[in-house]
Amino acid sequence: MKFGLLHLFESPAGRTEKQMIDEQVALMESAEEYGFDSVWPAEHHFSEYGVCGSPVVNLAAIARTTKKVRLGTGVVILPFHHPVRVAEDFAMLDQLSGGRVELGVGRGYQPLEFGGFGVDQTRSTELFDESLEVIQRCWTDERLNYQGQHYQFEDLEVRPKPFQEPHPPIWMAALSEGSFEKAGRLGLNLLLSPVFGGSLQGAADLIKVYRETLASHGHDPTTRQVGALVMTYAGKTQEQAREEFARPVMWYFRTFGKYVAPKVGQPAIKGYEWYTSMRDAVNAVEWDQLVEHGTVICGETDYVTERLSELKQLTGVDHLLGWTRLGGISHELMIGHMERMQASIMPSLR
């Protein structure tokens, strides 16, 4: 198993944006010092839920101060961007970093964000599909020729090409069974999270669907990776870990519930009906439920090691994206968590 750090760049009250951004960048820069394999900033807009509107800008800064850590996105929301610009930006980042890019992509889900950009959320799937194909062609074709519903290009030379050949690994965020199947059909790596209304057993079942689809479409499952976003915190003791991590986690869920779907009383968005029921669930969820379902793994180091080992054995996850820097948790607590992960947890799980 490999280990990464997910960064939402959330902005709860009480800290300036400058403080929050500086702290999260410092943690990302120190990731390789503490033995982590990757860092993954997440794109979000227009609320305290997340203020990293441009992961590529964030990662360009990290690329110049690190040597080994992989530079992932968790994720870039493709319907908000012109695909040629995405291809150019991440090809340049791949060149600047010497081939360390891991491009995570998704179609987005927050109505506030779609409205802010004037994008029709009901068309997110078709925008995502076209954008993804264009990005891959930009990276692999000498000249870009493409005729789609939303994008058309004729004999376009897109440069630079990525450092990695044929291109950086691409990861697709998946929630529904259909999206797991799509990732398998396309031969993409997979990003998933039991945070979003599921369980570890449910995740294992969907990963099985993904791997079966890979094989049935001519892709070798052993060459594709599965990354899991898990809220993980290693404390000095079981009780202290809960005391330190419960408040940030509950802040996250209450904030997530504000933006995941249309407001109560408003109609569900076509193609996103499930998110309305998710909104109601996350607004009512309590800490003990999160721990029981495996959404949160929090405790002293032996407990965290055991639970992560169960996750690995049950699901076959290759890459843990530790979701710890959330809800305004302090920089000092984050450093302590990273030190314990390095010393007591990661060595036995690699």
Q: What does each of the following model-derived ranges do?
A:
Residues 1-65, 69-71, 165-168:
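N-terminal beta1-alpha1-beta2 module of alpha/beta enzyme domains
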Residues 125-158, 200-317, 350:
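An alpha-helical appendage that flanks or caps ligand/catalytic pockets
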Residues 3, 31, 35, 43, ...:
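Conserved, mostly hydrophobic/aromatic
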Residues 3-7, 39-41, 71-73, 101-105, ...:
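Hydrophobic faces of well-ordered beta-strands that scaffold small-molecule active sites
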Residues 38-62, 77, 194-199, 323-334:
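Glycine-rich, proline-tolerant flexible connector loops at the mouths of alpha/beta enzymes
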Residues 52-73, 127-130, 339-350:
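Alpha-helix-loop-beta-strand connector modules within alpha/beta enzyme cores
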Residues 7-22, 76-84, 164-174, 233-235, ...:
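Active-site mouth loops of central-metabolism enzymes
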